[in-house]
Amino acid sequence: MKPGMVRGRMVQIVVLGIGASWIVPVAAQNRAEGKLDVDGKPVAITQVYAYAKEGFFDKKKQDVVVLLCDAPVPAPVMRDTFAYKDLIATGKVHCVRQTIDADKQVINYDVGHQRFGSLGENGGSTEHVFEAQTFDGKTIAGRARTKSPQKSFKDVPYTYDITFSAAIEPKK
């Protein structure tokens, strides 16, 4: 091999290594463990994503959306409600989404499972809670759960209890 080719390869390897070292800590920081139980059938939740958005009740503050799923969700789908609902309807993922305000209150929830149909199970309820461990604008960690067994609009019983930690992606 020519010295110039070797040097070029070495530069590529070093650049890739540096890039990977920046990505790995963020990915390693995101973790989820728990379950979503729909109609007596448990689903293990292993993925978590979090992103900031403009506050619904106070535009000067930010809300954080936490998406907890049993399978990876492509980045473009994470913030796209219609694409997200398509994944749910086809049974490719099962998810719990909570929108949490600056006061650490769940102001909206969505439980995505094909058993609920295309609309899913969503709304606002004090029965869906977030118990914060970390909530500093950069990281969100804690427990997302239902206080008691719930019933969907179609009378399908469900509960969830998930602990998680995730880096918060900035507003877009």
Task: Give a label for each model feature.
Residues 134-172:
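C-terminal or internal capping secondary-structure element at the end of a domain, subdomain, or sheet
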Residues 37-61:
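N-terminal targeting signals for Sec/Tat export/insertion, comprising classic cleavable signal peptides
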Residues 40-42, 49, 83, 88, ...:
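A mature extracytoplasmic/lumenal domain signature
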Residues 41-45, 121-127, 156-163:
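Amphipathic hydrophobic-ligand
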Residues 12-22:
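Bacterial N-terminal signal peptides
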Residues 26-28:
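Boundary at the C-terminal end of the N-terminal hydrophobic targeting segment
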Residues 1-8:
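N-terminal secretory signal peptides that target proteins for export/translocation
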Residues 56-134:
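Surface-exposed helix/loop patches within compact recognition domains
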